[in-house]
């Protein structure tokens, strides 16, 4: 098959399952087929393993499951979610994104909010470290506070644990098509950051959604 990128654009329905005859190379004489993931019955749909929703609901409904997982992932058993003067819990946010010019302004504005941001390695950790005035990304488990904002730097995680992070947070800021789908299955509010393409082609993809 020719596995293509996820999109909600109109061409996906037209192109899904079309043949792609191989005219040259080792596969000459064979036929590949275009497979387009998508959001309608005329596309390849979205991947979701059996039992995922049930596992998510069980995790989100189990008292103490989120805190126990966060203790393990952050590597600090003293980590606790904070509450405001009205006993309302803080907002827990996952940050997994590309380089984003608006990030410093968002972090600065978040200093006035009772909020903990879990910062993933890579683009996000480097950008947040720069905002903090650090020369490099801190070690996993490092915590910084600026006003009411708390920043916690995470270690790398594998896919099952990434799902648990998505399930744990009140808001997920994610990048790329695969993570957008996992954020959908998490059933939590999320913001999707597209990869910026030449000639602003990513805006057409965004408009289609």
Q: Which residues does each PLM region occupy?
A:
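Short, polar loop motifs at secondary-structure junctions
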Residues: 5-7, 122-125, 177-179
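Short, well-ordered alpha-helical microsegments
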Residues: 101-105, 126, 162, 180-181
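Short, aromatic/basic amphipathic alpha-helical patches
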Residues: 12-22, 108-110, 129-143, 205
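Catalytic donor nucleotide-activated moiety binding site of glycosyltransferases and closely related
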Residues: 114-155
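A donor-sugar binding/catalytic signature common to diverse glycosyltransferases
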Residues: 156-205
């Amino acid at each position: 098959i020719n596995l293509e990128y996820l999109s909600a654009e109109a061409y996906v329905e037209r192109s899904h399952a079309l043949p792609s005859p191989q005219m040259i190379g080792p596969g000459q004489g064979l036929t590949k087929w275009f497979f387009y993931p998508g959001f309608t019955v005329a596309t390849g749909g979205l991947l979701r393993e059996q039992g995922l929703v049930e596992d998510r609901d069980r995790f989100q409904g189990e008292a103490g499951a989120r805190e126990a997982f966060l203790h393990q992932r952050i590597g600090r058993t003293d980590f606790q979610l904070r509450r405001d003067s009205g006993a309302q819990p803080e907002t827990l946010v996952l940050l997994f994104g590309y380089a984003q010019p608006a990030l410093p302004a968002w972090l600065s504005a978040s200093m006035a909010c009772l909020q903990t941001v879990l910062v993933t390695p890579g683009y996000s950790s480097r950008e947040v470290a720069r905002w903090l005035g650090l020369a490099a990304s801190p070690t996993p488990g490092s915590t910084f506070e600026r006003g009411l904002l708390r920043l916690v730097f995470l270690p790398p995680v594998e896919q099952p644990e990434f799902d648990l992070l998505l399930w744990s947070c009140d808001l997920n800021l994610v990048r790329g098509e695969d993570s957008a789908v996992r954020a959908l299955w998490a059933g939590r509010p999320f913001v999707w950051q597209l990869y910026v393409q030449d000639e602003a082609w990513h805006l057409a993809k965004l408009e289609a959604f």
